[in-house]
Amino acid sequence: MQRLCLSNEQIERLQAIIESKQNCKCQADVSFGTVWITSDDELNELRVSFLGDFELIVSRVGFNHKHRGTMTAVLEELKKICAEVGVPKIVIQSVLTPEMQAFCHAQHIEPDKNTTMQAGEVLVGDYFLMLDS
């Protein structure tokens, strides 16, 4: 298993998307291979990391302004990053809201049958997207 981390350029691309779509200023913190991008007002955040060369994990997402295409643009960038480093899978960890469930469904991101359960109207848990090789 190869240990991967986002490059400074990849982090800057993600940061630029969030700043542009959310009209904010962000900073990125890197710790043990995990990248956490937050806005100065702490209303926007994205946390991503690699699990070796197996998958890229999105473990935290929060954007102040909805329906601006922020997560769609972030997902497209994450797909490019995975292609650059040869990672075949993106995992959206701990989907808890109807909005994120709807986003995953619209983007063909599938619930992991081993880690999801029905909680009211939301199928909570991890969702994954297998990428073309």
Q: Residues of each region from the PLM?
A:
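Conserved active-site alpha-helix within GNAT-family acetyltransferase domains
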Residues: 84, 95-118
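Conserved hydrophobic beta-strand within the GNAT/NAT acetyltransferase core sheet
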Residues: 90-94
